[in-house]
From Swiss-Prot:
NCBIfam families: nuoB_fam, PRK06411.1
Designated name of the protein: NADH-quinone oxidoreductase subunit B
Co-factor: note: Binds 1 [4Fe-4S] cluster.
Protein task: NDH-1 shuttles electrons from NADH, via FMN and iron-sulfur (Fe-S) centers, to quinones in the respiratory chain. The immediate electron acceptor for the enzyme in this species is believed to be ubiquinone. Couples the redox reaction to proton translocation (for every two electrons transferred, four hydrogen ions are translocated across the cytoplasmic membrane), and thus conserves the redox energy in a proton gradient.
Organism the protein comes from: Laribacter hongkongensis (strain HLHK9)
Source lineage: Bacteria, Pseudomonadati, Pseudomonadota, Betaproteobacteria, Neisseriales
Length: 158
């Protein structure tokens, strides 16, 4: 948490920014936006072997209850407005994790007329997880990188 000082009487001094960011990293609630085979790996990461619950990550069915969107799979042009609409319904602060080659840049279908060449053209992306499909370990590493990014953000001074 970055505690600056611990006094002898049991007091801890720190900044409000660090406390807020610490609480946000321990309670990420992702909204699944599974579009293709990467969604299977995302479900695998939520199962008992990797157990995202131990990191405080609980998958939510509604965008109004979530603060992290995991875009997993090929995003087509018809699905792009729905992705933006779901993103706009999420509460602030919100983060986006792009999972897989198709979500990152179109992947195997990059030159298709109906595929968006990266979900970052529709919503701002915070973390990219490469792979086709990326493993559950790669998704877990991407979530840990997002938690590190959240810890470094300046919350109150915005």
């Amino acid at each position: 948490m970055g505690i600056e000082g611990v006094l002898e009487k049991g007091f801890i001094t720190t900044s409000a920014d660090k406390v807020l960011n610490w609480t946000r990293t321990g309670s990420l609630w992702p909204m699944t936006f599974g579009l293709a085979c990467c969604a299977v790996e995302m479900m695998h990461a939520g199962a008992s072997r990797y157990d995202l619950d131990r990191f405080g990550i609980v998958f939510r069915p509604s965008p109004r209850q979530s603060d992290l969107m995991i875009v997993a799979g090929t995003l087509c042009n018809k699905m792009a407005p729905a992705l933006r609409k779901v993103y706009d319904q999420m509460a602030e602060p919100r983060w986006v994790l792009s999972m897989g080659s198709c979500a990152n840049g179109g992947g195997y279908y990059h030159y298709s007329y109906s595929v968006v060449r990266g979900c970052d053209r529709i919503v701002p992306v915070d973390v990219y997880v490469p792979g086709c499909p990326p493993t559950a370990e790669a998704l877990l590493y991407g979530i840990i990188q997002l938690q590190n990014k959240i810890k470094r953000t300046c919350t109150i001074a915005r």
